[in-house]
Amino acid sequence: MADLSSLKDLGTAQEASAPVHVRKVDAQGRAYATGKRKNAIARVWVKPGTGKITVNGRDFPVYFARPVLQMILQQPVVAAARTGQFDVIATVTGGGLSGQAGAVRHGISKALTYFEPGLRSVLKKGGFLTRDSRVVERKKYGKAKARRSFQFSKR
């Protein structure tokens, strides 16, 4: 049977092991994070600024021409109600445009939580901090695609 002092120790041990989210910023005052989606990997830096988003050295409307992809990029900043307060610099490699947009969104979300830990609950609730692990299913031999079989002829 556990005595009272061991129960107190257990409580303090649990408090100590709970993750404390601290601000992680480099010497220039930027928060860095990586985001992933499908085969795309994005390296993202967030710093206080005017709301400019740069992807691979180009403004994001130039790099991501489709309005849907532009909206995906802005979702975390809008959800956190920080529009026009942060400059974002991202370099993204691999995958297609949709995967790259998702990777940058994931990176922006993580970097915002490193810069301002208070935003974590809002972004977590919106699902921006969760890594979307869905990737293309591989093609199997004996099949036309991943699941589609070759046409079957009875006679």
From Swiss-Prot:
Gene3D superfamilies: 3.30.230.10. One of its GO terms (biological process) is translation. Belongs to the universal ribosomal protein uS9 family. Keywords: Ribonucleoprotein, Ribosomal protein. This is Small ribosomal subunit protein uS9. GO terms for cellular component: cytosolic small ribosomal subunit. GO terms for molecular function: RNA binding; structural constituent of ribosome. PANTHER family: RIBOSOMAL PROTEIN S9, SMALL RIBOSOMAL SUBUNIT PROTEIN US9M. Pfam families: Ribosomal_S9. NCBIfam families: PRK00132.1.
